[in-house]
Structure formats: C-alpha cells, structure tokens
Amino acid sequence: MATVGEWSCVRCTFLNPAGQRQCSICEAPRHKPDLNHILRLSVEEQKWPCARCTFRNFLGKEACEVCGFTPEPAPGAAFLPVLNGVLPKPPAILGEPKGSCQEEAGPVRTAGLVATEPARGQCEDKDEEEKEEQEEEEGAAEPRGGWACPRCTLHNTPVASSCSVCGGPRRLSLPRIPPEALVVPEVVAPAGFHVVPAAPPPGLPGEGAEANPPATSQGPAAEPEPPRVPPFSPFSSTLQNNPVPRSRREVPPQLQPPVPEAAQPSPSAGCRGAPQGSGWAGASRLAELLSGKRLSVLEEEATEGGTSRVEAGSSTSGSDIIDLAGDTVRYTPASPSSPDFTTWSCAKCTLRNPTVAPRCSACGCSKLHGFQEHGEPPTHCPDCGADKPSPCGRSCGRVSSAQKAARVLPERPGQWACPACTLLNALRAKHCAACHTPQLLVAQRRGAAPLRRRESMHVEQRRQTDEGEAKALWENIVAFCRENNVSFVDDSFPPGPESVGFPAGDSVQQRVRQWLRPQEINCSVFRDHRATWSVFHTLRPSDILQGLLGNCWFLSALAVLAERPDLVERVMVTRSLCAEGAYQVRLCKDGTWTTVLVDDMLPCDEAGCLLFSQAQRKQLWVALIEKALAKLHGSYFALQAGRAIEGLATLTGAPCESLALQLSSTNPREEPVDTDLIWAKMLSSKEAGFLMGASCGGGNMKVDDSAYESLGLRPRHAYSILDVRDVQGTRLLRLRNPWGRFSWNGSWSDEWPHWPGHLRGELMPHGSSEGVFWMEYGDFVRYFDSVDICKVHSDWQEARVQGCFPSSASAPVGVTALTVLERASLEFALFQEGSRRSDAVDSHLLDLCILVFRATFGSGGHLSLGRLLAHSKRAVKKFVSCDVMLEPGEYAVVCCAFNHWGPPLPGTPAPQASSPSAGVPRASPEPPGHVLAVYSSRLVMVEPVEAQPTTLADAIILLTESRGERHEGREGMTCYYLTHGWAGLIVVVENRHPKAYLHVQCDCTDSFNVVSTRGSLRTQDSVPPLHRQVLVILSQLEGNAGFSITHRLAHRKAAQAFLSDWTASKGTHSPPLTPEVAGLHGPRPL
C-alpha cells in the first residue's frame, strides 16, 4: 500500500518516491500525458524552459529562477507564449517603406481554420512569415544545446528524435492553433477573476460600424513597429467564438482564392505590388509551398488541366465544431438541416459543385464516381461511358487505377517522385531518402502492364458466390413487383414471335398462340389435373416430356443429370414457386458461367397447353431450364440439333469427354476403336461417380429403324448409364430410357431365360417396365454410337480464361501461362464462343485443339516452349478436352484453330479451298472468341500472356515432331506428317544440311472439304540450311461432312535459295510469305 510520500506507477505498479518524475523500474512518466494536457499547453501554460536546467519560468522572468541563466533574445523581441509546445521565433523588425502597408481587416484563411484577426496597424510581410515557418520546421527555434520536450519539459540532446523520459515526439503533429482562433463559446469566470467586457477591436465590423472602413495611409514619419503581443489570458478579448472546422486530413495551407474583379478591393486597401485580378499569385504560392515541402501532389489533388482550387467554405454554419475551453475539448456535430439540392459534393475531393455540372471542377471526377456494382469488372468507363476500360484513355483522357498507381506527379528535371511516399528525390539518389524505395521500381511500374494472374477457385465456392449475387438481384425484382402489385415480365426475352425464332411460315411458329403463366396453363396429362404447380416435386428422369422442338440432345443430358437430383437443384437458383413469376437459372454457356433471369410465361397453343418441353406432375424445372437456355442462345429455334455432351457441359460446367464406339464414316483413315480402353474408362468413371450417357444408333452409324425397334431400342436416342459391372468375366451395363418405357429385350434383359441364378439375385433385373435394363457390352458396342462422360468433381478447383483465335499469324498469339504449385490432376476444355446463336453472322465450327507444354519465362516475360506434355485431338466441334497429371512448375497452354484464316493481302493468290461451300467467304470481321476452362484437383495459377509471333510455329513443330509420322526423304532431310485424328494435315520439313538449301513442293490439289493456311493447296518453299518449316496446314472446313486429303511431296537439294524453274518469278516461297502467314510458315532455326 502506497504511503503519503509515494506514488504508484501506472505501467508496472511500482511504488516510487514522491519527488521522482519517472518510474525507477520501467521509466514510465508519473503522469500519463493526455490530449487535454497537451492542448492546454497553448492556453494556460505560458512559460519558457531554461536552456540549461530545463526549468519552466513564467513569461515575466528574464532569468531562470533556479540556475540564473539569462537567455539572449533577438533585439526588440519579447517573451512570447509557447504555442503547442513549440517556441515561436520572435518576429523580426521589418523596415518597410512608408505607405507600403495599409490597415486590413477581414477573414484570414489558414490550414483548416477560419479565424477573424483584428487589424494590427500594419500588414505583415508574407514572405517573412513563410521564412519563419520554414525555420521553425527545420529546428531553428530550438536552443543550440538541445531541445525541450513539449510534454515533460526535459532538456534532450540535439540528436534525439523523441524524449528520453516520456517518449514524446520532438515535434507534435497537432495543428498550430493561435490563441486568436481558439473557441470559447461561453465564458464562466472562476472565483477570484474579474472579467472585463472587451470592446470590439478596431477594424472589425460591429454595431454601427462600417463593414469595410476606408483605408488610411500612415504618415511619412510612421515607423513600423513589431506586432504587439497582447497580455495572455484564457479570457482575453482576442479570443473570439470562431468554430474550428474538422478537416478529414491535414493539408498544406489553402491559398486565398482569387477575387473577381467586381468584388476586389481598391489597390490602396492591400499590399502594394501584389498582382490583381488573376490567380497567378495563388499558383506560384502553391509551387513554392510544394518545393519547400519536397512533396509531390497527390493524385486526387492534381488535375490534368492545371492547378485547381478546393475552397474550405467561408461559412461554418453547417460544419462540425470542436470547442477548446480551459481543460476540456467539446465536439459538437453539425445539426441536421434540409438537404441542399443546388450543389453536390465530389466523392474524391469533397468540393461542392453546381448540380448541373457533370464533373468536379477541381479534380475532374465524375458526378457518379464510386457507384460500381459488385461483380464482374465494369464494361464501361465510369467517367466517359466508353466501352472497354482499357482503351478508355483514348476517348476521355482518364486513366485506370492501375495506371494511376504507376503515375506520380509532379516530377521536375533532376528529380523523381517516390511511388510509395511521394517524396521528391534527387535524380542521382538510387533509393528514396524517406522510405528507401528503389528508384528502379518507378521505371518498372511505368512500363508494367496490370497483373492478370489469378488463382483457381473452388467449384462449390464459385457456385455459392454466384448464387448470392443473383439472389440479391432477384429479391429486388420481387420486392418491386410486390410493391406495385404486378407480375414480372422479362423485356430482354419478351413473349413474342422473336423469342420463338422459327420462320414465319413454319408450323411450329404458327402453333404458338399465346404465352401463359403456370396458373393459366391447362395440363395435357389428365392424371395431373389435381396436382399443384411447383418447381420440384421429387423429380425423376422419367418426368421429362419432349415437345415440338428437336432438342433431344438437351433433354437427354437433363435426364442423365436427373439421376442426381442434387445436381438439377444446383442448376435452378430459384427452387421454390415465385408468385411474382421471376426465376433464375445458372448455366455454363460456351464455358462461361451465367445466371439467367426468366419469367414464367411459357408458349402455349390455342387450348392453353404447353408446346415445348415440360415435366409431369406440374413441375416447372424442365420448362424453366429450357427457356433459360433459349434466352442464352437467342431463341427456341436455336436449340435444335446437338449432342448430349454439349448439354452435359452446359448444365454442369464440368469437363466432358466423348468416346466414339464406331469408326468414322466420313474419315475411314481414323484410328481404330479400342473397346478395351473404352471399357476401362467406363469402369473408372463409374468408380469416380461421374455422369455417363450413351447415344443409340446415330452419328456415324447406318441405322435400320425396324431392327432397332424389334429389340426394344429407339434409334437416335440418348440413354443414361446407371451402372457398369464386370461379373466373372462378363461385362454388363445397366441403362435407362428417359422415356420410362421401351426396354431392351435381347440377351441379359429381364425376360432372358439364361440368367444365372446367383446373378439374377445380385443384379435384380426387374425394371423393364420403367425403362431400366441390363445389356452385355458386346451388344452395347454393336448398337450404340458413343459414350459421353461428364466428370463432375465437387471438390475440384476451376479457372476460366477468355481469349480469341487469331485469323492470321500477324495477330497477337494468346497463350495461357499455368503455374502448378503441387502435383495435381488437370482437365482442360476449350469452348468456341457463339457457335449456336441463330443470329451469328459466321457461326461455323472451328477446328479446335489444345496443346500443353512445359514452359520457361525469361527476362522480359519471353516465353520458351519446352516438351509437349498433353494435347487434345484437333476436331471441328463446339469444344474439345484433354487431361494430364502435372508436377509443380511453369507450363503454357496454347489454343489454336486454322479453318477460319482469312485470305491474304491483295496482289497475292486468292485463297483456295476444296469444299462444298468453297465460295463462301470464311473471314470474320472479328476473330472468334474462345474460353479455356482449367479444372484441377489442387490450387493453380493462370494468367493470359501475349507470346511472340513465332510461338504458334514452334508449337506446331513440336507437336508434329512428337506425334506425327516421320519420313526420311533424303540424307539430311526429314519430313513429319500429322493426319490421323487431326481433322486435316500438317506437314513439317527439316533441313539438316549445313550449307545446301532444300527445295520442297507440296501438292494437295486433289483434297476435298479442306482449307489451307497458305491460301493455296499447292506450295513451293526453299528451306535454308539448318532450318525447318511448317509447309502447310490443311483443316477440315465443314464438320458435318466428310473430307479427303491427298498430298504429293517433291524435293531437291540446291546451292541457292531461289526456286528457279519451279516458279515464274524469282523467289523463295510460293505463295509468298506475307506478314499474315510468315509467323507460322517462316523457316525456323534448328
């Protein structure tokens, strides 16, 4: 327990003697410094510290009471009060010519303060004030032997930056508030004090006084005298009730704004020689201030048009008030008032602008700046509204946030601005003097492009995020409909002929008579009349009923998905009946997840029955998903014809693979079908829980409908694969007909008499009445065309990268850089965008291909391709896929397509194609877009990068050498052919001769339904020594028609590069290698 002569430390509770100022254990000060104590330093503690013993003496004492030390003030200076713990330098005696200054009254604008200062009989020189202020900041006002702590008055060494006792800073960061600006809202005199009412100072407007009295000039003998310091008192007459506006940050002192000519005082009212009627003085004052502070202008304060001005409002009626009275600080928020609709406040610099102004007059910020919805990156510039924020700088002059971070203003010759702290450093300084940021970083940030690398996202996390954002929009729509008592109508897909999309004279178009909501629809199934409408009601695959549309590819995929009801529920974001008729469906269109908003108005006939797909027992999920898909592709008409694998990819967004069971009738030279490998893939897919479907009697097969129907099968129909079993060497599959009827009646069917007893009890073949049956694998291969596998991984990661297929080698080549952090299994899927839209100008399918390489990135991001690790087959389809197991490292994924390459420049041979539609121009105004979907079992990083023009040639050469057929034509020459399974032909020739040229002629004029990247089916080339070249790439043009390729190769050695007698004109390549094809077909060094 502490005695009378002891005190307890607030930090360590040690009992210290009463005369000790700090704790002897932890050196904590006896009294914890607080804000009120610091603020009172400028109000009531008007003492000066002794430079020798640090004792604080009253202002009236000329010598220290303790040690007798007498300071040596400047001539004519008086002891001044200590303001905020800093001894101000006494003002020097100014010798101004007589008549140079006049009495001046009015508001004096300071940093964050608006105070009214009485006239002092002379005008203070502003340059001298700036000099004094700068000297105070540099420490000129401190004693030479050290400095006094403004908190505990201890005299510290000159090199110390903080007090050694209390830890206080050498200089306080509080604003310097002169006594004249302090607010005393009400004066309450304590006991023993007599307050004398103060008369208004001369020069201030008061009762019966003019607001602007005429200025009087001083006489010739009038000498300037130092400003008289009024006797200090907390209740001095110089203290006026002036509120101190609360600023959002400390800023340099604002300049007095230029006064319009009509409101300017006469020249005799101010300092002589000051420029009148212009803002030149303010601009130069700002430049001098910035050069003195050595700080660059902040981005939000600098404008591209010049120096702007942010006024601090001369009236503070609407501002928050901070009152400093005695030992208290009182904060009074501004009282609420009626909103001011004549002005708006800038969100960036807080300047109030007129309502009609679309931009801030100070910083140029848009009136709507800062209002951006959460979601995908904005597609319009927030300032000018131009499409694509990347080229926005060319349309409105504004820069993106990434460019703002790289641009630092202003920089002067011989200086550079630090991007971290904005300090202006000398050009010879390699690091910032304040924060040590290297100067090299400035140059790197100027030329660096914004980072586009991103991590893959968990599949389930992505779905939950998309649903959360979609539900917020849905709730707003439903709330609006409820308030206005209306039902939702989707104006972007209106109930009309355009949404149906069939030709005007088509029978389907004519049968659509009306669009009805569920409560208005007549049910076509009699047993469902008493059922109530719902989105789901214990959904089953057999609930699906096809309508007039030929979209069985989609319904077959939906039936396969219905084997897992949880997957169907993930497709429907709105899972319960909505009285307002607004529903949301989440689909993956062309590899991109999209949440589609639709209403519940469905096309019906004149009897009120649904015409398109529906579900039994008055369920809406089939009709709503079909309508959402029709909206995505433009109309119901666009949903006709397709493959079940496309539907699975659209509904799940998962990687899908199709296994062909039959040889291609359009290309007999394709690789033979390996039934054992397909069986192994089906077994592993079943164990992994993947979805599987099978196409019966379609595609490449010649079908006899009567033969199929006699066996209980339906040709050109999709079945779901429920189970795959290998029982005692017998390969069996269990399938389901989505119709719920028509089952297989051959061997291993329910009524087959040769069932082994133990297998009948184990496999329980009793579902033929519901369309479920067992089938032997041999019969399955005989009657079915293909197997579609949907690899649904609920715990995998996914990333999707958009890009485009260049239509020539002169366009930038897009490559996706892939960073694998730990060993992972990856699936790649490449989708062509807009391949199904009915309104597309050129929606023909491309010959898609994926190539995965080991890669290295050198200095400057230079990409070097390594070994080929995986690839897909080149196929004219809506999407292709491949899978690979990758170790940690850097990889590059190249996506390519060639059958859309445009014709060469004028003056060169016209493009030559041998196809049924050779006369149709294939060049598209814009390169076709694509989406690369990356699925991985572990976290990976993806980044789209721009490769060199020759990267595509290097990728094709590595592919052909790795997977093509090798042919040694002659000594030192090697030819590589890639044709089987590649939807065309690729020919690469290698010349290993150290000195001789190799002349090669490739003739493919007898080919059919192919197009050449060279623009001609006949080429001649001269390959230099120790080089190799991609001679030609032939690509299948029409995917639904067969193609044939014949090629003849002639070659010879030559001492010169010219082709001589092979061409009419002297040259090394025919057709010539124009910039459009040189990047792909130019010779490459070995």
From Swiss-Prot:
GO terms for molecular function: calcium-dependent cysteine-type endopeptidase activity; zinc ion binding. Changing residue 613 to L: In OGIN; uncertain significance. GO terms for cellular component: cytoplasm. Changing residue 969 to S: In OGIN; uncertain significance. Its EC number is 3.4.22.-. The keyword Zinc applies. Changing residue 800 to W: In OGIN; uncertain significance. Residues 125-140 have a biased composition (Acidic residues). The keyword Membrane does not apply. The modification Phosphoserine is found at residues 296, 335, 338, 1070. Residues 111-148, 199-280, 299-321, 1064-1086 are annotated as: Disordered. Residues 223-233 have a biased composition (Pro residues). It comes from the Eukaryota. Residues 487-793 form the Calpain catalytic domain. Keywords: Deafness, Hydrolase, Metal-binding, Microphthalmia, Phosphoprotein, Protease, Repeat, Thiol protease, Zinc, Zinc-finger. Widely expressed with higher expression in brain. It is an enzyme of class 3 (hydrolase). The active site is at 552, 717, 737. It holds the Pfam family Zn_ribbon_RanBP. GO terms for biological process: proteolysis. Belongs to the peptidase C2 family. It is linked to Oculogastrointestinal neurodevelopmental syndrome: An autosomal recessive neurodevelopmental disorder characterized by growth deficits, microcephaly, global developmental delay, hearing loss, and microphthalmia and/or coloboma. Other congenital anomalies include imperforate anus, horseshoe kidney, and structural cardiac defects. Some patients have been reported with normal motor and cognitive development. This is Calpain-15. It comes from Homo sapiens. The gene is CAPN15.
